[in-house]
Amino acid sequence: MVDPNLVTFVLTIVNILVLFYLLKRFLFKPIGEFMENRKNEIKQNLEDAEKERQEAEKLKEQYYEKLRGAKSEAQEIIQQARQREEEIIKEAKQEAKQEADDMIARAREEINQEQKKAIESLRSEVSDLTIQITERVLNDTIDKDQQKKLVQKYLKEVGRVS
């Protein structure tokens, strides 16, 4: 009769071998292929990156050459811009001064017109008040005490109106 431990041992070995075969076939092989593909992809990316770096270096050199050539042109443009700036500032100052003078003249004219209107309005109000006071005085025959009270009352009214 066979020892049960030996059978278990042999079955365990067989199971391990079957598991190893299955892992190798379905896990290790695809992972190995994936790793190889990934390695090739990384290698290709590194080669592409090196080519792009070299091309970028060439472009950088061309850029610096153009930059060196453009410095004198830039200085000339800056000088022209400064001259134009000074001209614009001078023109703006002249325009601002002219506008300010015009605004002051218009403001003075408006003030004069408003002053004339105010004086005319006051004259009209004083005239109306004088007429009202005269009418009341003539309509009311009163003694001196009542007259004083009436004048004070009218003066208070005039004070409120103005």
From Swiss-Prot:
Secreted in keyword set: no
Membrane topology note: Single-pass membrane protein
Assembly notes: F-type ATPases have 2 components, F(1) - the catalytic core - and F(0) - the membrane proton channel. F(1) has five subunits: alpha(3), beta(3), gamma(1), delta(1), epsilon(1). F(0) has three main subunits: a(1), b(2) and c(10-14). The alpha and beta chains form an alternating ring which encloses part of the gamma chain. F(1) is attached to F(0) by a central stalk formed by the gamma and epsilon chains, while a peripheral stalk is formed by the delta and b chains.
Role noted for this protein: F(1)F(0) ATP synthase produces ATP from ADP in the presence of a proton or sodium gradient. F-type ATPases consist of two structural domains, F(1) containing the extramembraneous catalytic core and F(0) containing the membrane proton channel, linked together by a central stalk and a peripheral stalk. During catalysis, ATP synthesis in the catalytic domain of F(1) is coupled via a rotary mechanism of the central stalk subunits to proton translocation.
Top-level taxonomic group: Bacteria
Residue ranges of the TM segments: 6-28
Compartments, as annotated in UniProt: Cell membrane
GO CC terms of this entry: plasma membrane; proton-transporting ATP synthase complex
Family named by the database record: Belongs to the ATPase B chain family.
UniProt cross-references to InterPro entries, sorted A to Z: ATP_synth_B-like_membr_sf, ATP_synth_b/b'su_bac/chlpt, ATP_synth_F0_bsu_bac, ATP_synthase_B_chain
Keywords: ATP synthesis, Cell membrane, CF(0), Hydrogen ion transport, Ion transport, Membrane, Transmembrane, Transmembrane helix, Transport
Protein name listed in UniProt: ATP synthase subunit b
Major localization listed first in the record, in broad terms: membrane
Molecular function via GO: proton-transporting ATP synthase activity, rotational mechanism; proton-transporting ATPase activity, rotational mechanism
Organism per entry: Natranaerobius thermophilus (strain ATCC BAA-1301 / DSM 18059 / JW/NM-WN-LF)
Keyword Cell membrane: yes
CDD domains linked: ATP-synt_Fo_b (cd06503)
Signal peptide: none
